[in-house]
A protein has these predicted regions:
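Short basic helix-loop element that most often maps to the first helix and adjoining turn
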Residues: 8-25
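Short acidic DE-rich linear segments
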Residues: 67-69
Length: 69
């Protein structure tokens, strides 16, 4: 998944839940700028940050590991 697509998913879910960037920022401890940059695909967040955001937004993430031939 591309960072832009990830950001769109996070932003769309946040809006469905009627949450502000500020509220998401308070929960995750990330700055509003960082949340905005993630939503706009301007940064590539670490997996632990994505996990924390997904937890708050009640989203599930599935990681699939495949062997490259």
């Amino acid at each position: 998944m591309q960072v832009e697509e990830l950001g769109k998913i996070i932003r769309a879910r946040r809006k469905v839940l009627n949450l502000t960037i500020g509220e998401l920022s308070e929960y995750t401890g990330l700055s509003r700028t960082t949340i905005s940059d993630i939503e706009l695909g301007k940064t590539n967040p670490r997996l632990d940050i994505i996990t924390e955001i997904f937890r708050f937004l009640n989203l599930e993430m599935k990681i699939e590991v495949r062997q490259i031939k």
